């Protein structure tokens, strides 16, 4: 009898030990989504790994920092070779393409106790066609415009920016008045702002810009089954933008990327940028310069003369690739759960992104009124379409449309072609 009891105890103890301890080596890849206190890229991720391994020494993590320039290709090459990383921190667009191709591990088990605390909209954009969750949503944040506060104050134009107005909504007329005043007061080597379109990069900024302005110009219909950006107001918005570039209200960014345009803002060569966010602001800490000092970016929604503004937004999180090695999968899920829910490190992850937490369990640690204002901007989130069929193709058609319109081609015809080609991409 004693022998039987001892045997049961021994077997149970071994099972418990096996459940708690996992021995595996996993690969963790991410784009530059996080900033570190040292200012060195990758230091934060390594600190996160070190903290996790302190509690889980039997799990080794190989870390790779991808670049936005060629990171997507590196991932695809790894997938093509049948050797993708175990976990990637990215956005829903790419992640759900992998999910719908059967490459990812469902994460509903990891999220089982956390879903009630996560913003419903973020769960929706983290699910695949089978309605299972393939991205663990961790942070989010709006994309908006930003203005150089100190520059506007020095020029005596700060009162033309309605940033003290409740929720800061404003019209195209107010925006145009400010741009005109900036054009007349700025020296010739500086510009009120840049409309960039050299490449596809940062095109969430140009799309958000162009669906606002006069307003009532959606990119897609309500059920995402058809592109509709060729309506009279869509034509008016693009026509206004082309004329603004010709008259100097905006700098013609045909030879400028989104990074170039943001750099002009950061260096105070442009009074405002049409693409900014708390995450981007954090990336440029120590680099903003106006008259030898840092300056205050004032965040603003896009002007809209018909309704509330419509904003693009970022959602970020992690996915896990399928593998036949159950120990690696278990170890990877353990690392993901630590990253998203640890009492100390979940908060640090959000702080390092410069964004807002997807979970109500995690707070925003800042007293900066401009960063806090971005929580107001969340109410203006528009459609999230980065995960629909043909999204990558649509981006190419969008860039072509901007170039054709700026070159003088008929805007209605340009947008008709954009809608036709983009609708065809939905069928792929």
Task: Kindly label every feature range from the protein language model.
Residues 60, 246-247, 287-355, 400, ...:
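Extracytoplasmic/periplasmic substrate-recognition and gating elements
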Residues 130-139, 143, 171-226, 270:
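Extracytoplasmic/periplasmic solute-binding protein
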Residues 6-8, 12-97, 112, 159, ...:
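Conserved N-terminal structural module of periplasmic/extracytoplasmic solute-binding proteins
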Residues 176-183, 222-258:
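Glycine-centered hinge/linker elements that transmit conformational signals in sensory
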Residues 67, 90-144, 153, 173-174, ...:
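Hinge/lid segment of periplasmic solute-binding proteins
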Residues 108-119, 165-168, 193-199, 216-236, ...:
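Short, solvent-exposed loop/beta-turn-alpha elements that line the ligand-binding surface or hinge
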Residues 14, 297-300, 348-404:
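Long, aromatic- and glycine/proline-rich binding clefts that accommodate carbohydrate-like moieties
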């Amino acid at each position: 009898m004693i022998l039987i009891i001892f045997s049961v105890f021994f077997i149970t103890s071994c099972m418990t030990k096996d459940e708690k301890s996992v021995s595996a080596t996993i690969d963790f890849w991410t784009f530059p989504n996080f900033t570190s206190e040292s200012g060195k890229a990758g230091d934060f991720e390594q600190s996160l790994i070190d903290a996790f391994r302190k509690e889980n020494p039997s799990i080794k993590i190989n870390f790779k920092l991808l670049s936005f320039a060629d990171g997507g290709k590196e991932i695809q090459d790894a997938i093509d070779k049948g050797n993708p990383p175990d976990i990637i921190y990215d956005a829903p667009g790419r992640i759900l393409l992998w999910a719908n191709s059967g490459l990812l591990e469902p994460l509903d088990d990891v999220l089982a106790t956390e879903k009630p605390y996560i913003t419903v909209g973020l769960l929706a954009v983290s699910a695949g066609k089978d309605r299972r969750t393939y991205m663990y949503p961790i942070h989010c944040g709006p994309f908006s415009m930003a203005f150089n506060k100190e520059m506007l104050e020095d020029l005596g134009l700060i009162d033309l920016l309605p940033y003290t107005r409740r929720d800061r909504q404003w019209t195209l007329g107010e925006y145009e008045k400010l741009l005109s005043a900036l054009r007349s007061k700025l020296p010739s080597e500086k510009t009120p702002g840049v409309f960039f379109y050299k490449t596809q990069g940062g095109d969430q900024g140009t799309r958000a810009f162009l669906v606002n302005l006069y307003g009532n110009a959606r990119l897609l219909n309500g059920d995402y089954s058809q592109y509709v950006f060729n309506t009279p107001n869509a034509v008016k918005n693009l026509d206004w933008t082309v004329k603004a570039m010709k008259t100097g209200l905006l700098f013609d960014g045909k030879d400028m990327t989104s990074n170039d345009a943001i750099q002009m803002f950061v260096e105070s060569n442009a009074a405002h940028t049409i693409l900014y966010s708390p995450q981007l602001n954090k990336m440029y800490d120590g680099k903003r310069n106006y008259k030898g000092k840092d300056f205050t970016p004032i965040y603003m929604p896009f002007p809209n003369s018909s309704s509330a503004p419509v904003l693009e937004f970022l959602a970020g999180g992690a996915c896990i690739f399928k593998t036949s090695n159950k120990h690696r999968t278990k170890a990877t899920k353990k690392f993901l759960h630590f990253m998203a829910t640890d009492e100390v490190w979940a908060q640090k992850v959000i702080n390092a992104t410069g964004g807002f937490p997807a979970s109500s369990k995690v707070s925003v640690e800042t007293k900066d009124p401009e960063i806090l204002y971005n929580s107001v901007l969340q109410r203006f989130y528009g459609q999230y379409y980065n995960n629909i069929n043909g999204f990558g193709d649509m981006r190419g058609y969008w860039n072509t449309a901007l170039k054709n319109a700026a070159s003088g081609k008929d805007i209605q015809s340009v947008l008709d072609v954009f809608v036709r080609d983009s609708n065809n991409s939905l069928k792929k």
